[in-house]
Regions:
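Acidic (Asp/Glu-rich) catalytic motifs at the cytosolic membrane interface
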Residues: 1-27, 61, 65, 124-138
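A general, composition-driven signal for non-globular sequence regions
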Residues: 8-9, 33, 239
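Aspartate-rich (DDxxD/NDxxD/DxxxD) Mg2+/diphosphate-binding motifs
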Residues: 18-40, 70
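Alpha-helical transmembrane segments and adjacent TM-loop junctions that form the membrane-embedded core
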Residues: 38-269
Length: 269
């Protein structure tokens, strides 16, 4: 029960940190942060993973080992079981909401594939925490029930260790994914493919020489180097580029900035 209590405290603090990160990520570009602060959500997501590892995983494991060394008889198992059942219902509702949001964006991908490819760190964290919480409640319920039936506090201690181990594994797995986002990832594969097809179908563009996408929180930055059709004047070329940019931003609302570098095809009439 104490292990799940520690996990709940960490979970509550984590939600506050994610809200703080989402708020900061919405700040507009400035002189100090010319590309905006979208990636700050990755920093706070990484802090959340560390809290899950330390406050959740390590403390729960320590509590379990301590109870192995100095067993304590379980008191009021009926109340403990009732609390766990209520918590399981609440966590189930929360996880269902997270899964609903994931289903909006994962398409035909499996949940594991979405997890590995997702650029939405906040949703990733919430889904991982809720899944771990629900599994942890199952461990806690089993341990409390076994201790209540047998009168042996060993099961309660083993339950705490199991919960701690689960949280450590989840925290490390999430940290690896968040670390990749912190370093810098391109837009999701399906977004990059859609951008490429859009540009290839633009009559003003002859060939794409280089296309770089950078995920900045919920926003994407695009850097394009392409061969444009030869225009009679630089003014007409700039007009074509502005037209492409306007259509591009309308088609991809998640794109915040587009940088284009033209390479004129000399043989084009």
């Amino acid at each position: 029960m104490l292990a799940e209590g520690l996990h709940s405290i960490a979970d509550t603090g984590n939600q506050g940190l994610l809200l703080l990160g989402l708020s900061q990520a919405k700040k507009p570009p400035s002189v100090r942060h010319p590309l905006g602060q979208g990636r700050v959500i990755y920093f706070w997501s990484f802090i959340v993973a560390l809290m899950l590892f330390s406050m959740g995983g390590l403390l729960s494991s320590y509590e379990g080992v301590d109870r192995l060394i100095a067993p304590v008889q379980l008191a009021s198992p009926g109340i403990a079981i009732a609390i766990l059942l209520f918590a399981a219902i609440a966590e189930g509702i929360s996880l269902r909401a997270a899964v609903h949001e994931i289903n909006k964006v994962r398409g035909e991908r499996s949940y594991w594939t979405w997890f590995k490819e997702s650029r939405q760190s906040a949703l990733l964290i919430v889904a991982a925490e809720d899944s771990a919480a629900l599994a942890g409640l199952v461990f806690a319920f089993t341990a409390v029930l076994a201790s209540a039936i047998t009168g042996n506090p060993l099961y309660d201690a083993l339950g705490s260790i199991a919960i701690g181990g689960l949280l450590i594994v989840v925290a490390i797995t999430v940290s690896v994914q968040i670390k990749s986002l912190l370093v810098g990832e391109s837009a999701a594969p399906e977004v990059r493919l859609a951008i490429t097809r859009f540009l290839e179908n633009s009559p003003e563009i002859i060939q794409i020489d280089s296309l770089i996408t950078l995920q900045q929180g919920d926003q994407v930055i695009v850097l394009l180097k392409a061969e444009f059709r030869n225009e009679p004047s630089a003014i007409k070329l700039l007009a074509d580029m502005q037209q492409i940019k306007a259509a591009f931003l309308a088609a991809f609302p998640q794109v915040e900035m587009v940088y284009m570098e033209p390479m004129i095809h000399a043989s084009q009439p």
